[in-house]
Amino acid sequence: MLSLLETKIIEPFMVVRQTLAPLRLSRWQIFKHMTRILIFSSNTRTIIFCVLMSLVGYIVSRIIWGRQEKYPDHGLPIVKTNDYHFDNIVAEGKRLYPNQAFMGINKRYKFVIYPSSSWEELKRIPEQTASIMDFQHVCNSGEWSLVGGETHELVKTITAELTRSLPARVPNRQQDAKMTFDTIIGHCPEEKGFNLLMTSLEIIAKINACTFVGRELGANKSWVTAVVYSPLWVYFAVTLCNATPDILRPLLRPLFFLPALRNYWNMQKLLKPKLDREMETFRQTDDKRKLLVPKSDQDLPFTHFLLSRYTEAAATIKQLVIDYIQVSYTSTPTTASALFHALWELAQHPEAAEVMRRELATVMIDGNLPKTHLQELKRMDSFLRESFRLHPITRFTLQRYVKEPFQLSDGSRIPPGVMAVVDAQEINRSPEIWENPDEFDMDRFYRLREISGNDNRYHFVTTSSNSPGWGDGTQACPGRFFATSTLKIVMAHIVMNYDVSLRKVAPLKSQPLVNGSYSPDDSVEIFFKSRNVE
């Protein structure tokens, strides 16, 4: 057996590695070459041998090391279950260790779970010490999915240029919303049913695409389909990886991510002609500042925003493709989840639609929203924040992957490699903070804003210790202003043009996932009926 291993596997690998060394190939490239050799040059006996050796190795590792798991030295109690999610772990941890941090361990991840009292300390920890991007990168196999690999240039572009452009782009985005609904929902003289999850994804993907890649590509069905399925393929791959034994995961991960990679290749093919044109325009323009001014009759110059921040060496077509894929990915599932739950609540509270219609009538002129961040829509803002409070996309907030050790005032020592989070549901459902916390109250935050001195607080987009959905501090969600604007434009179009309803009113069956996030109930059907607008 050892002779077969040496002659069939080890020796060919060493020869190939030495031969290819001058080419400076990556491990992945070497792995692909070895795979071809193994499949096309070896006999069936060798392939079977490799599979058996992998299985034997896994079994032996489980027998010898399976019960010798070591945990970092953090000085915290440990709560471990065989669950694939964290809901039961958090409940047990809070019962055993109320108001203190503990390490929660499920079948895949180890999180240090902090109470909300640690909010201010955690939010001030700098990114070089503990990073939310690295947290997302680790939890979503970022080296394959690209999640969590956003450059600082991309983040700054979203935070600054994109956010500043939003007021002037409101009329354009209203037109994008109308085109999107005409295409996806259409005129519904009678009630027409739609799957709420997939419809929410498609609406947000199409409207956002018109902003980022322009209306021509945004109206391209292939592009919209690729954006819609991008998070679904990543979710599919990550789920399979999480269910795979550790020893086999590196071998099977490329196979699991193949659909996601093919989807990315399709997106790159669609993007390249547009990016080639825009990069050439940027290179040939002497006064590049003129290219950075959004014009109402043109697409948003998002490519030029990015190019103005990158150095010439870093501003490659490859980097821009990655940026566009990342911004399409990150802006779609979270906003679609918020729309999903807002429509679910709207269908159960039809009186809310009439309240929002009256409010819209006071700010709209000839059907047009004002060129602002739409902060005038206080009732709609309160509705969206209340829905976001009851239906977060994840039960955790201030998620951080620790890169450098730190210690908090509670005495917990957090070493590198640990993931730290705060339980957001402790805030969202707290009876000490909210009256009737489990009930939907569309005017909850509107009433709070009406109190003297509170007008700049309790907005949907606000980051604070009682608004955990966006995070807080320097690592708060950079796209929250864009997402809020998108949702208000979409909700305005819906309440002015449609009535929505549910045939079956039942509690949502949101699925808790292994990394603490929630997957919306994909069985909900919602019905649209066009209003008789005079």
Swiss-Prot record:
- A single Pfam family it belongs to is p450
Main location as per UniProt:
membrane
Which InterPro entries does the entry mention? Answer: Cyt_P450, Cyt_P450_E_grp-IV, Cyt_P450_sf
Q: How does it sit in the membrane?
A: Single-pass membrane protein
- Which pathway? Secondary metabolite biosynthesis
What's the superkingdom here?
A: Eukaryota
Named cofactor requirement(s): heme
User: What GO MF annotations does this protein's record show?
Assistant: heme binding; iron ion binding; monooxygenase activity; oxidoreductase activity, acting on paired donors, with incorporation or reduction of molecular oxygen
Glycoprotein is among the record's keywords: yes
**Induction remark:** Expressed exclusively during fungal penetration of host leaves, the time point at which plant defense reactions are triggered.
TM ranges are 46-66
Which cysteines does the record link by disulfide bonds?
none
Q: Which GO terms describe its cellular component?
A: membrane
Work out whether the entry's keyword set contains Secreted: no
Annotated glycan sites = N220, N515
Role description: Cytochrome P450 monooxygenase; part of the gene cluster that mediates the biosynthesis of a tyrosine-derived cytochalasan acting as a fungal signal recognized by resistant rice plants and leads to avirulence in Pi33 resistant rice cultivars. The first step in the pathway is catalyzed by the hybrid PKS-NRPS ACE1, assisted by the enoyl reductase RAP1, that are responsible for fusion of the tyrosine precursor and the polyketide backbone.
- What name does UniProt use for this protein? Cytochrome P450 monooxygenase CYP4
Q: Which organism is it from?
A: Pyricularia oryzae (strain 70-15 / ATCC MYA-4617 / FGSC 8958) (Rice blast fungus)
The gene name reads: CYP4
